[in-house]
């Protein structure tokens, strides 16, 4: 028979306790963390949906790699393994290991960017934007119009607006440092990018001589969507879909903490010899020597194995379908969501959930706090806390959307954990009218969402 | 200086997990070194028999550290391993604030960006490659104020890591305290041959910098090894526990960068520490861009767990006696055989004096680079050049910097190799010493812009 139930294509080999606290305890923890769950201790959290980055459960095969990791400073065998796996997957000649994705970004965007430069993306993620802007360049987002509409059911809402790209390239060619496609598009709701869109973007880039960089940290999940949603792709293996995307680009950056199924690590992959030389110089100064880049040998082993496991048909089926499961449950409860459900997370539209909270009182942050108080669930605001800026008069320039991301760590939580999350949303919906906003009482210069302090309004 | 009796450094541990070594033939090694451009950094680890390239990140972890690895908490924010590590850093080293980084150079990057302004001058007890590179990237200039004995490989002065107070006072006089964001103080001094600084000297440096309101930033990667030498050689400290001396050293400084890959017995990791609230705030803003959120700094939770345990183990007196004892054992063997080495023997390696080993080669023929390459061909032992190639070029003139010391570092990883391995290394160096007149120098055929020693390529000069 054909089952409707999607079971995990693995069983559990090692477990880790989670703590179940009371609502009173959580209220005290949240106050001590200034209403910013980034500042909570992990032992104060019951279900940690803060991020899918670095939080995967590794396989027995990966743990065995941890044990055999070669910690030689230069020429480590584990590097040899990781390099050949990445080269084979991406097709790029030059592979530079980094301690995580943001280091790969800093190195390449440091080379291609600088004051006056322009970077164009389907949507820049928070650390990407910070990297680019701290160097004095400007980051411009041009997702397709449907990508900005939470209710649109467009199958590839991560796509870039090619007409807008053509206009920008025609007008600003000299200033453009690179075009960046993030697959899947995290900020836009974990939405996929179609192979057809990458093909068009690549053609525009090549016509104008601008490098195309793929941020490939969730490229296996993206491949699942391409295979199941894009005409003519249903028989193409996931890995092959990824390879075709890489073939259309000039470089790739990856945080291996996502689809690398690793707890740490990343890489930069490049075609151009001269650019690779420049990047290697920076790599050595800030990250580590070219054959470890700031990673332990054991982590390179884990990445090499993880990058192979992630393209397994049954793994990807489980991964995408289990994320959709949570999305569908919340949808049935009437929770306003970013539709359709993406690959690694469910995004709640806090602006529609809490229409009474104005944008400058951060409805997303309010939901994040409510989920923690009610159930110890840790989530993250992806809205005006993360992306808001101030105009010359000091008024908030809000983000396009006020989302809350429930990111699902890979292979970590079971269906009953997910049921617990869904049940919590029943309560959130019942009490939605009581929700209040927050104001920021303290914020740092960069990436304020990580460490800002809040207090409830009123 | 007394040589400890052999029994005194017997390892205070037994072996629980082993890793195979690779044996190669001379023909294979000849081919491998040619492919690696006569640069030992570019050899593959499977072509190496005994790997003395570095003591950085190459330690054998204890069973407790491996257990810590299994208990790593990989939460993105607020991992309990972070809180535990913070407590250990504060308790063992005494600094108020701490930010984890993926390794030592991550911390160097942060402190250089926070404290150095273009045009600043940073005096220090001899340069280190990555430290100097970060200071220069931030617009500063390094000035060497180490005692003269440090540049003399034959001097047996016990504290060749000391700062020359007259030199430091002259630098302050010349540039003014406002141009000096901090004194960069390393324990021990790697480029001088792993040489320690005395507590007496450090106290005097503290007194002088205090008068002028200048910070001391401590490169503390081998502080426990330095403390061991103080315990052994400096009057009045023989009966103080290692922990106590380490705490005093740290208390005489204002902040620190740490590569935990050395003393702290881990394969990856480091941190920045400071007693200043404002420096901490600024560095915490920067760390999210370069490294990771301040509660993981680019480290897996498990690696923070291993570091917290490793720091405690590194401060054990018996551990340190065995650690330094093994290095001294190798050094004493080579001295007995008449091999020119940096005296006295340092704490983390034995440094061959390539100028004296190969007196027929001028420094332009890269004698230390050549010696390291030939030692590999001879015996499969991988060492590292620390001479003219590592020193790089003078930013102003474009010419090679010509350091007085032209060394090959035989660095001993912690808890990895046995006495028999040390005997093999000693015999290999002796064999090469007998054949030294056949060694021709090298010609550099590829030179990267920064930190050239990592990736430079060479060819052998034709024989006479």
Regions found by a protein language model. Give the residues of each.
Chain B
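Conserved active-site loop/cleft motifs that coordinate metal ions or position small ligands
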Residues: 99-100, 382-385, 409-411
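Conserved small-domain helix->loop->beta segment predominantly found in fold-type I
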Residues: 295-304, 309-373, 377-404, 440-450
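Short amphipathic alpha-helical segments
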Residues: 268, 348, 406-410
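Conserved PLP-enzyme active-site core in the AAT-like
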Residues: 2-38, 42-45, 51-60, 65, ...
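C-terminal, active-site-flanking charged/polar segments
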Residues: 22-25, 370-377, 430
């Amino acid at each position: 028979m054909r089952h409707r139930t999607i079971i995990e294509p693995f069983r559990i080999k090692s477990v880790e306790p989670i703590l179940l606290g009371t609502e009173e305890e959580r209220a005290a923890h949240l106050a001590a963390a200034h209403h910013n769950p980034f500042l909570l201790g992990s032992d104060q959290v019951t279900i940690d949906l803060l991020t899918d980055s670095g939080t995967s459960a590794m396989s027995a095969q990966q743990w065995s790699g941890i044990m055999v990791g070669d910690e030689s400073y230069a020429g480590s065998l584990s590097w040899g393994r990781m390099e050949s796996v990445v080269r084979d997957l991406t097709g790029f000649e030059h592979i530079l290991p980094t301690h995580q994705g943001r280091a790969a970004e800093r190195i390449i965007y440091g080379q291609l960017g600088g004051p006056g430069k322009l970077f164009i993306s389907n949507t820049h993620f928070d650390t990407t934007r910070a990297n680019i802007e701290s160097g004095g360049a400007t980051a411009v987002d041009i997702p397709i119009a449907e990508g900005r509409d939470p209710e649109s059911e467009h199958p590839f809402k991560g796509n870039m607006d090619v007409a807008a790209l053509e206009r920008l390239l025609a007008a600003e060619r000299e200033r453009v440092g690179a075009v960046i496609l993030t697959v899947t598009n995290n900020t836009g709701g974990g939405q996929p990018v179609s192979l057809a869109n990458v093909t068009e973007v690549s053609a525009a880039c090549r016509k104008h001589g601008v490098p195309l960089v793929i941020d490939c940290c969730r490229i296996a999940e993206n491949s699942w969507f391409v295979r199941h949603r894009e005409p003519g792709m249903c028989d193409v293996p996931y890995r092959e879909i990824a390879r075709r995307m890489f073939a259309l680009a000039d470089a790739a950056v990856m945080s291996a903490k996502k689809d690398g199924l690793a707890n740490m690590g990343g890489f930069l992959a490049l075609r151009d010899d001269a650019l690779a030389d420049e990047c290697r110089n920076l790599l050595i100064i800030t990250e580590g020597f070219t054959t470890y880049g700031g990673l332990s040998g054991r982590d390179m082993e884990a990445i090499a194995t993880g990058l192979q496991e992630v393209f397994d048909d049954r793994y990807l089926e489980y991964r995408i379908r289990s994320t959709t499961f949570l999305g569908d449950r919340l949808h049935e409860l009437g929770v306003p969501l970013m539709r359709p459900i993406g690959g690694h997370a469910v995004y709640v539209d806090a602006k529609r959930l809490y229409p009474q909270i104005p944008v400058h009182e951060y409805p997303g942050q309010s939901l994040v706090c409510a989920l923690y108080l009610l159930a110890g669930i840790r989530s993250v605001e992806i809205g005006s806390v993360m992306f808001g800026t101030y105009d010359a008069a000091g008024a908030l320039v809000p983000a396009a959307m006020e989302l809350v991301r429930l990111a699902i760590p890979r292979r970590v939580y079971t269906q009953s954990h997910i049921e617990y999350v869904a049940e919590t949303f029943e309560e959130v919906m019942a009490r939605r009218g009581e929700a209040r906003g927050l104001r920021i009482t303290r914020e740092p210069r960069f990436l304020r969402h990580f460490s800002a302090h809040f207090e409830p309004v009123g | 200086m007394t040589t400890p009796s052999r029994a005194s450094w017997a390892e205070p541990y037994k072996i629980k997990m082993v890793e195979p070594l690779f044996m190669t033939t001379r023909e294979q090694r000849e081919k491998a070194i040619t492919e690696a451009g006569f640069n030992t950094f570019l050899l593959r680890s499977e072509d190496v028999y005994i790997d003395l390239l570095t003591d950085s990140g190459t330690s054998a972890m204890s069973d407790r550290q491996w257990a810590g690895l299994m208990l790593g908490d990989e939460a993105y924010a607020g991992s309990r391993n972070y809180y535990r590590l913070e407590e250990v850093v504060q308790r063992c080293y005494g600094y108020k604030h701490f930010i984890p980084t993926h390794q030592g150079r991550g911390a160097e990057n942060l402190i250089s960006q926070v404290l150095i302004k273009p045009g600043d001058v940073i005096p220090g007890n001899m340069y280190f490659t990555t430290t100097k590179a970060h200071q220069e990237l931030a617009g500063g200039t390094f000035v060497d104020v180490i005692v003269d004995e440090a540049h003399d490989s034959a001097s047996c002065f016990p504290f060749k890591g000391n700062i020359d107070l007259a030199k430091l006072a002259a630098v302050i006089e010349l540039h003014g305290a406002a141009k000096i964001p901090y004194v960069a103080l390393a324990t021990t001094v790697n480029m001088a041959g792993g040489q320690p600084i005395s507590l007496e000297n450090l106290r005097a440096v503290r007194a002088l910098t205090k008068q002028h309101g200048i910070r001391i930033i401590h490169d503390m990667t081998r502080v426990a090894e330095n403390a061991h030498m103080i315990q052994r050689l400096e009057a009045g400290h023989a009966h103080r526990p290692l922990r106590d001396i380490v705490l005093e050293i740290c208390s005489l400084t204002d902040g620190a960068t740490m590569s935990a890959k050395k003393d702290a017995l881990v394969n990856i990791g480091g941190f920045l520490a400071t007693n200043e609230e404002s420096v901490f705030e600024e560095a915490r803003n920067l760390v999210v861009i370069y490294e990771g959120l301040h509660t993981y700094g680019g480290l897996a939770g498990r690696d923070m767990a291993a570091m917290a345990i490793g720091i405690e183990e590194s401060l054990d007196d018996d551990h340190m006696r065995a650690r330094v004892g093994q290095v001294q054992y190798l050094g004493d063997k080579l001295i007995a055989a008449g091999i020119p080495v940096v005296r006295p023997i340092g704490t983390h390696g034995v440094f061959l004096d390539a100028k004296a080993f190969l007196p027929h080669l001028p420094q332009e023929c890269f004698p230390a680079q050549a010696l390291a390459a030939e030692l590999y061909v001879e015996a499969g032992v991988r060492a590292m050049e620390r001479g003219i190639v590592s020193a790089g070029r003078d930013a102003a003139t474009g010419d090679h910097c010509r350091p007085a010391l032209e060394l090959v570092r035989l660095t001993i990883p912690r808890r990895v190799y046995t006495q028999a391995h040390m005997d093999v290394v000693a015999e290999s160096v002796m064999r090469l010493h007998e054949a030294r007149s056949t060694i021709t120098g090298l010609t550099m055929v590829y030179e990267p812009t920064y930190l050239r020693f990592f990736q430079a390529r060479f060819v052998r000069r034709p024989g006479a």
